[in-house]
Amino acid sequence: MTSVPGDEFVVSVSNLNQRYRNTIALDDVSLAIPSRRMIGMIGPDGVGKSTLLSIVAGVRHLQSGQATVLGGNIADTGFRNSVASRIAYLPQGLGKNLYPTLSVLENVDFFGRLFGQSAEERAFRIDDLLRSTDLEP
């Protein structure tokens, strides 16, 4: 993948390998995502999408390979803790835990409150998400 001059990679992984007992989830995966890009990961069940995303989000320790996220090594506990609040990750199945009586905006706002964000911070982040995903009303 070539980058546009001035772009930084927000995610860069190389030679990732991950196993669950006898099942290979990731086999020598390398990927670079430039900043200011929206991507989608599409594929059948069991090909490693959730495993890759959980490593990038820092919720799963990588077994081998390298993962650089937001300019640092996501395997480093100190770095991971320092950027955790800047990474949004909704694991597969967790969507069942959203509140059906709340709108999407109300659900996002609710979880922002759980993480201690001020009303101003939540409003800023929600507005930013809506703009960056072209979902603004």
Task: Provide a role label for each language-model segment.
Residues 42-44:
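The feature captures the beta-strand-to-loop junction immediately N-terminal to the Walker
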Residues 57:
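Helix-to-loop junction immediately C-terminal to a conserved catalytic motif
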Residues 109, 113, 120-137:
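Conserved ABC ATPase "signature" region
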Residues 101-103:
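Ser/Thr at beta->alpha junctions that act as helix N-caps
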Residues 23-24, 81:
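Short coil-to-beta microelement around the adenine-binding A-loop and adjacent beta1/P-loop entry
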Residues 1-17:
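ABC-family P-loop ATPase nucleotide-binding domain
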Residues 66-82, 89:
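ABC ATPase NBD Q-loop/coupling interface
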